[in-house]
Swiss-Prot record:
InterPro entries referenced in this protein's UniProt entry, alphabetically: Glyco_trans_1, Glyco_trans_4-like_N, Glycosyltransferase_grp1, Mycothiol_biosynthesis_MshA
Residues annotated as binding Mg(2+): M313, R314, A316, T340
Function (record text): Catalyzes the transfer of a N-acetyl-glucosamine moiety to 1D-myo-inositol 3-phosphate to produce 1D-myo-inositol 2-acetamido-2-deoxy-glucopyranoside 3-phosphate in the mycothiol biosynthesis pathway.
Source organism per UniProt: Jonesia denitrificans (strain ATCC 14870 / DSM 20603 / BCRC 15368 / CIP 55.134 / JCM 11481 / NBRC 15587 / NCTC 10816 / Prevot 55134) (Listeria denitrificans)
Keywords annotated in UniProt: Glycosyltransferase, Magnesium, Metal-binding, Transferase
Binding site for UDP-N-acetyl-alpha-D-glucosamine: Q22, P23, G30, R240, K245, E326, E334
Source lineage: Bacteria, Bacillati, Actinomycetota, Actinomycetes, Micrococcales
Name of the protein in question: D-inositol 3-phosphate glycosyltransferase
């Protein structure tokens, strides 16, 4: 392989969830946003991106043009619907076959890089990269060993097959991309990744889509438009309804606040999202709300599109993220871009996404008592709230997709040069 030009065409693989899917339900989340926004930003810098994902409905077109230079290709691999993520490894041969068939219709050397997202995609990615004689760049997004070390009560551990699959992808990848220094350290210590091939590239945020309110009048007007009272404290949770994201912690903390301060006005907790993995998860969370006696203070909202999500974030006093783990936590950066501070668990990438006591607060554990105490301080200290609100937008402005794309393209280039040297 000889390198005479920057990577101008990238094959991105995203097997288990489409970048076009609505975040906040099923398996769709921050990774979906990451893939499509990174692709758009790289295309704006002159690199074409084709994203391969598994077809999940019969009426999905073969190809969708997302933006200039960005295509999503739907690959048939197994049943369209009703296939659990845990069953997807059995469909990887069909998915890989579909990816290779697309490239076979092109002139040789069509793609310069394969970039896979999540371990399932890495399994298909290393075969495609080997066939096309191009480097494989891989982003884990989440890792089984990390998740298993921080399981929520009653949550099932990730299977041994996934751990083995991740080890294989780490070994086969020419470059590994981590969201944070902490994730890079986990790749090295938990998966024996060569530090020389691990690169840290921070995700971004669309600062034009996620903006602060112009003034208090706009904030109050948006609250009314969303069915809220113009005054009063509002806490927003936005994410999939699953133990990993910890919405149960917020419900229990709210119940403690109510019992400890029965005469104080209660905040409204808005839970935005749908179930993931277990369809019963949403019903169980609703039942928990009633059992804890806080139903009148909790509002459930379906997964929201980007403009509506930005509205919810603008009207909130705080966005809360009691996740058991996050490789980064895009919701945190989106909220802060709206000028809303974040109260987050002190885990994973959230320690980078949130600047403690500057743009938000990091909570040391997942005990409802601890969260109730932090919420009590955060809601009761007006000076702290205003200070964090001022710092939130400043912190978010450090993260842009344009910067992410620039750094990622640099990783591609270094990886291609190294591969060229190694193969002579």
């Amino acid at each position: 392989m000889t390198v005479s030009h920057p990577a101008h065409r990238v094959a991105m693989l995203c097997v288990h969830t489409s970048p076009l899917a609505q975040p906040g339900t099923g398996d769709a989340g921050g990774m979906n946003v990451y893939v499509v926004e990174l692709a758009r930003a790289m295309a704006a810098q002159g690199t074409e991106v084709e994203i391969f994902t598994r077809r999940t409905t019969a009426n999905q077109p073969d190809v969708v043009e997302v933006d200039d230079g960005v295509l999503v290709r739907h690959v048939t691999a197994g049943p369209y619907e009703g296939l659990d993520k845990n069953d997807l490894p059995g469909q990887l041969c069909y998915f890989t076959q579909g990816v290779l068939r697309t490239e076979a219709a092109r002139q040789p050397g069509w793609y310069d890089i394969v970039h896979s997202h999540y371990w399932l995609s890495g399994q298909a990615g290393w075969l495609a990269a080997d066939r096309w004689n191009v480097p494989l760049v891989h982003t884990m997004h989440t890792m089984a060993r990390v998740k298993n070390a921080q399981l929520a009560p009653g949550d099932a551990p990730e299977p041994r097959a996934r751990i083995i699959g991740e080890e294989q992808v780490v070994e086969q990848s020419a470059a590994l991309v981590a969201n944070t220094d902490k994730e890079a350290h986990e790749l090295h210590t938990l998966y024996a990744a060569d530090p020389e091939k691990v690169h840290v590239v921070a995700p971004g945020v669309d600062l034009a889509a996620f903006t602060p309110p112009i003034d208090d009048h706009q904030r109050q007007a948006e609250r009314v438009a969303l069915g809220l009272a113009p005054e009063g404290d509002v806490i927003v949770f936005a994410g999939r309804i699953q133990p990993l994201k910890g919405p149960d912690v917020l419900v229990d903390a709210l119940a403690l606040l109510r019992s400890q301060q029965p005469d104080r006005p209660m905040p409204t907790l808005v839970i935005i999202g749908g179930p993931s993995g277990r369809p019963a998860a949403l019903g169980e969370l609703r039942a928990r709300v009633f059992q804890r006696g806080v139903a009148q203070h909790v509002r459930f909202v379906p997964p929201a599109d980007r403009p509506t999500l930005a509205q919810w974030m603008r009207v909130a006093d705080y966005v809360a993220m009691p996740s058991r783990n996050e490789s980064f936590g895009l919701v945190a950066i989106e909220a802060q871009a709206c000028g809303t501070p974040v109260i987050a668990a002190d885990v994973g990438g959230l320690t980078t996404a949130v600047a403690h006591k500057k743009s938000g607060l990091l909570v040391p554990d997942h005990r409802p008592q601890t969260w109730a105490g932090v919420l009590q301080v955060a809601l009761g200290d007006t000076q702290l709230r205003e200070s964090l609100r001022a710092g939130a937008r400043r912190h978010a402005q450090q993260f842009t997709w344009d910067h992410t794309a620039t750094d990622m393209l640099a990783v591609y280039e270094r990886t291609r040069v190294a591969a060229s040297v190694n193969t002579g």
